[in-house]
Amino acid sequence: SMDLDCGPLITAKQKERVEGFIRRAIDSGVPLLAQGQIADGVPAGGYYIAPTVFGPVPRGHELACDEVFGPVLSVIPFKDEADAVRLANATDFGLLAGIWTRDGSRQTRMAKDMQCGQVYLNCYGAGGGVELPFGGVKQSGHGREKGFMSLEEFCVIKTVVQYHGD
C-alpha cells in the first residue's frame, strides 16, 4: 500500500522556484522517471507540487548541485563507495545524508567521511526528534538547532581562575 505524506510548500515563491527546477530539468533533457499526483481533497490554494523523480541526473546539473527544497529526487549513479562519498561531498551544501547498506563497516566509514551535519543509516528522518542536534555544514546551516548543543549558541563561557594565597 502507498503511505505518502507530502504536504504543500511554504510560499507561492517557493512553489514557483521548485517548478522552475522541474521545468529546466525537463527542458535540458534530464529523464523524468516518475511523477506522483497531488492527493484528492487537498485544501484549495495550497502550494502543492507532485513528487518528481529524475535520473540519471548529470553531476554538473543544477539538480545535482543545488538545494531544491521541494519534492524532487535526483538519481545520480556512482561507481563505488569512494565515488559516492566524493560525489556527496563535492556540493556546496551539507545538511544531511542518507546511506542504505547492510554492511556495518561501510555504514561507519561512510558516515565518518560524509561532510554533513546529520547522517541517517538505513532510514531517513527517523528519530530526528528535539533531543538530537540538527544543523549542516558548508552553506547548509549555521550551528546546531535542537538538543543541548543548541543552547551553546545562547551561552558565553567564562573561565575564572582565582588564587586564594597560602
What residues fall within each predicted segment?
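Helix-centric, low-specificity signal for extended rod-like, repetitive segments
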Residues: 7-10, 139
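Short beta-strand to alpha-helix junction loop
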Residues: 9-19
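Short secondary-structure junctions
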Residues: 29-38
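Conserved C-terminal structural/oligomerization subdomain of aldehyde/semialdehyde dehydrogenase
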Residues: 38-41, 45-166
